[in-house]
Amino acid sequence: MAMPCTWASWSLAMGSLCSRFTRSKGGYDVHDGATCTTYVRVTGGGDNGRGVAEYVSPDDITAATCSSAVGGNVNCGTGAAVTHSAGSNFLIYWDADESRELENGPSITKASGGTLLSATGCSGNNGTKNTPTLTADLLGDWREELVLRESSNTALRVYTTTDVTTRRIYTLMHDPTYRAQVAFEQSGYNQPPHAGFHIGAGMADPPKPDIHVK
């Protein structure tokens, strides 16, 4: 299912939304979710097939955006170019720091460079979109697992990080926003799930979850 006009791909506790434009309009913008005030608008031509926004560097104090229709990454607050490696497909919490890594098909890379996982024998889905079968905090750390199909279509594989982190927060599936977006990841336009609170540089303790698992 592709949204015809705009699609809100990202939200933070501060209420910012990043919308990518499809079809003839192209590009994307970052705006206030409550007032619709536009922080950043980036123009582009043609359909903007993919787009993400997230803290992808441990040093980020503002998220960066990237889309397939507009080259390079920009700061969500100022629109200034940032030097991180461009990645517009998918995101995943994988290593020890609070920033997110870039996921594309069967591989995970750092925005600063370097491959963290290359899943030999597995493939992405949806043709050129090259999306994973699922990314979600399945095992209860707060980092996310990567579910991929084998290229032979005979099995699914679940990959998990082995990196040890000093960050201690509850499993992301206890956050109702994240939990709903994991379901949406499988039933709507396939994009990575996001928590309802900030994870990254300068993060505060997350709010106490109101979800209880028996």
Task: Describe each region flagged by the PLM.
Residues 1-214:
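Extracytoplasmic/lumenal domain signature
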